[in-house]
């Protein structure tokens, strides 16, 4: 009779350990999945910060510089004599 109760106790303890182990595995899997989703979101934000934002900034800045140098600052036209002197 004593052996039967000890076997039942070990069986219950084994089930408790199994349930705790399964819960830990599920928790670790869910946390890893959520961390990978968070990492993907961070990488997309990093891609936006490092690739798209500088390219948009450079496009806008170069457009401003192009307008500035082509519309506002125009060098005086060279005379024919000045062109000949510069080429010599």
UniProtKB/Swiss-Prot annotation:
Topology with respect to the bilayer: Single-pass type III membrane protein
Subcellular location field: Host Golgi apparatus membrane
Gene Ontology, cellular component aspect: host cell Golgi membrane; membrane
InterPro entries: E_protein_bCoV (IPR043506), E_protein_CoV (IPR003873)
Main subcellular location of this protein, as a coarse class: host cell
Regions of this protein lying in the Virion surface compartment: 1-16
Subunit annotation: Homopentamer. Interacts with membrane protein M in the budding compartment of the host cell, which is located between endoplasmic reticulum and the Golgi complex. Interacts with Nucleoprotein.
Family: Belongs to the betacoronaviruses E protein family.
Known function: Plays a central role in virus morphogenesis and assembly. Acts as a viroporin and self-assembles in host membranes forming pentameric protein-lipid pores that allow ion transport. Also plays a role in the induction of apoptosis.
Protein name (record): Envelope small membrane protein
Species, as recorded: Murine coronavirus (strain S)
Gene name of the record: E
